[in-house]
Structures are given as C-alpha cells and as structure tokens.
C-alpha cells in the first residue's frame, strides 16, 4: 500500500478571504486553488437549514437568503469568549475558523494529491497572546500540526525578501485588508527579516469602503423612490455585493454602472436600481478612510526612529491596495512608487509557505536560511513596591526573548509574594493593563530585602508570554502563561502609547513621589533597625530625636504629604551619619580602654 506524499503549507487566515500556498521542490511558491477554482476563499461559514456546513463562495451566496445562519469576519472575535449560536449548538471563533481551515486543507489535498499535516498560519502583527493562541487552536481543530504562527507583514516581507540578495533595506509593509489595517517597518538583509516597528487600526478595511458605497446607493435610491433599502435584509445584501464589485471595477475603470433589477417592490410594483458611480465620486466618499491610515504610518516611523525618505521599499498587501487613490496617497507620503511585484492578495500566504518549507526542511527550502524577527508591541513588567511598574521586556523588543530581574521582599518575615504582571508604557502599574497574577509561597521568613526572587519573562516564537518567579534561596518556583484576556486592538495599543506621551510630565512627577516614599520608608526601616541594634551606643537625646523623626516620617508617608516627607527625609539623612559616628567613637573608646 503506497502512502500518500505529505506536503507542508502556509495559510493566510484572513478576515475577509483566506489563501493557502506551498513551496515546490524548485523553490517556486504556488497558491493552491480551491474546489471552485479560485485562488482566494471567502472567510465565510454558513449553516444550511438541512444541517449542511458551507464554507467559502457557497457560504457567501447564503448571505442573502440565510443571513442569520451565515458567519463572516469571525477573525475579529478570535481570542474572545464570543459564541455563535446555531440551533441548539454553540461554536467558538476557533471552531468557525477551523471550518475555513478544513476547507483549505481538503481542497489543497485534492489538488496536490497528497496529505497535508503541517502548516504555518499567519495573524496580524497586533494579535495579542489570546488571539495567537486561538489561531493556533483553530489550526489544531482543523487537523494541522501548527509549526508556527507568524505575523502577516513578516510573511509578506518573506515572500518579497527571497528575491532580494545581499542588500540591506528598510521596508514598509502597508497592509489594508478586508477588515484590518496594519503597517510594519522591517529591516531585511543577510537572511534576517526583522520587524522594527508596527502600528495599525484593526477596525479599518475594505468593508468600510464598501459601506460608504452602500450608504451612497441607499441614499440616492431613497431620494428617487422614498424607500430605504437598508430596512430590507435581502436588498441590503445585494447592495453589499454590488458595492464590492463596483469598488473592484473602479481600480481599473474610471466609472462603473450598478444595475440591480427588482431590488424591492412597493404597492405600485417592482423597483429597479440603476446608477453610475465614477472613480472621483468613490474617492470623495472614501478619502477620509484613506487618510485614517496616515497616523499609524507616522507612529511606526516614529517608533523606528525613521523619516519617510529612509524607507527603501514599500510593499502593498491586501486587495484594497489596488485602489489607485491608496497608491497615490503612499506615493505622496514617501515620494516613491510602492512596489507592486508582490501580489497583494497572495503575498502573505506565499511568505507563510516559504517559512513552512524552511521549518520543515523541505527540498525547495534547502540553503534558504531565513530568520524572522518579530517584536512585542508593548512593554511587559511587574508591579513593585509603592505600585510602581518595573519593566522587564521593553516595547519593540525582538522575539523570541527571555529576560530576568531579581527582586526582594518589602516586609520583614514575608513568606509569600504576589507577582502582578502588567503591559503598558506608564510608570505606575495601575495605569497599565493587568494581564494576570500569581503567588509564590513558602519563602523562609527573613528580614525584608534578604530573600532573592528572580522573575523571568519568556516570550516564545509565537508571541506567547510565560512568566515565572523563583525563590533563589529554596529553588521554589511558580509559573503562569499569560492568558491574554485583555484583547488589545491596534487603537488600544496606539492609545496606550499616546497616553504615555500625553501624561509623561504627570507620570514623571508621580513616579518621583512614589520613589521618594519608597526611599523614605527604606530609610525609616534602616534607622529603626540601627536603633534596635546600637541604641545603647547612642546618647539618649539623639536617640529620642531619631525616633521622633522616624515616627513623623512614617506618619507623613501614610498621609501622602510629599513636601513633609521630603523635608523629614533630608533631615533624617543628615542625622543618619551621626549614628555611625557614635558607634565608631564608642568602639574607639573601648579599644583605648583595653590597651591601657
């Protein structure tokens, strides 16, 4: 019995469309057509009344007649606890996505005449831990061994990077898909592709452009006939299909005719929609949407510390980038034509296929030693004494990455510590996002500052975060995987970065105040300890003065009286030196007495 040949593939699991590709033994990459003969598969799943599950184009056709049982853009819900309820059964976003992946797998196996087990699947650069985990789970449910989850712009750069040799370049990937916008800046050279900055907006895409055409059509029709087509589900779906078709046509034509006979009916009889949409009208309807991509571009350039003229190449990803207004907009910002050599619909899947072939050691990938370097979008760290945020892995660090810092206890005799993990750019932990917490117990009682607790953050190549805390004295360790309950969109991430800039002065002041309180508390603790140990060597009046100062300082700390803390801290710092002097003098006097 002959066993079937096994293939490895790359998959672009998109919001609107999905694509599957493989690398041939001759190193060329082929996009695999689906059973309908198309190179892209709509990311749509429909449940027919008879219980059949339809995926792709057949499901898209159900949107009109069976809209309540048809699911599109499920990618937006990945990593959430959202459920799709069909009849009495609930489906998670992973399960719906798995139906799409299963179709891609089945159709590709038919086409290649073999078996597909291993795959690299892509996700937006801004997907957080929960969203990446969900993408991986969808792959597993669909029957794949998921070799790696990689960022879409990284994959696009990989598809592009293989045919560039020996030249270091700064590449900007402008990815405007059906539902999301991502911009990434990469460094390509010497077989290394490194993401140096990413930004975007995960609620901006081709769907929004379609919606503008739908609104215009509905408005014009209402003016002509006094009927609101948006009230009619079936009419609205026909408008949506017509809008998408018109948008695509206007990329190559200056005008398009939209004809929808029998769109609706009134008591007088049927009504037909006949309209002409020009490219200039389409541009005036959507110019502000294109303009919305400017800010993320500026943010990415700022993060990468680059100016537009520093960018060597601009790669376009996503069908929307075929729109002439978008290409002109990019040209206006960067002063150069975007590179159109990469097919915008297929680049991501092709890059994923290349990475899959490299990871699987496929024949076509021999000698191709590509290293993908992604970055973490926000700083990760823990809460320390006084509620301060102590960064452990800074924003835009390349992953995979592992970093550790050693901390200690804040109280005498402390036998456990709570490790609270935060993500964000603000110096006060509470202003950042709490990702999770866990306790390390069983620390032997000791004075504060003595135990040594090593906290380690480890981000793997899929961008999944593992945190551990280890008592270096006993070897006891506790770990957690960040579950990523906080689903951050690109807007959330950009807002976090902007807030950090906006509140910079205020945050700096608050941080300085907390640090002063911490230093004051440490000083009070030190003086207290010294008085207990050496009190008999210090004159009574000085001892009383120090005790009063310590009590006053602690009172000021409790009342958060910053001015008083500062004054008492400075005074206690001056008095502190006297303790040493008295101890030294007394010891000297004792030695002289012994020598006589």
UniProtKB/Swiss-Prot annotation:
Domain of life: Bacteria
Protein's gene: dnaK
One GO MF term: ATP-dependent protein folding chaperone
Upper lineage: Bacteria, Thermotogati, Thermotogota, Thermotogae, Thermotogales
SUPFAM superfamilies with a match to the protein in the record: Actin-like ATPase domain (SSF53067), Heat shock protein 70kD (HSP70), C-terminal subdomain (SSF100934), Heat shock protein 70kD (HSP70), peptide-binding domain (SSF100920)
Family: Belongs to the heat shock protein 70 family.
Pfam families for this protein: HSP70
Phosphothreonine: modified positions: 180
Induction description: By stress conditions e.g. heat shock.
Protein name: Chaperone protein DnaK
Function: Acts as a chaperone.
UniProt entry keywords in alphabetical sequence: ATP-binding, Chaperone, Nucleotide-binding, Phosphoprotein, Stress response
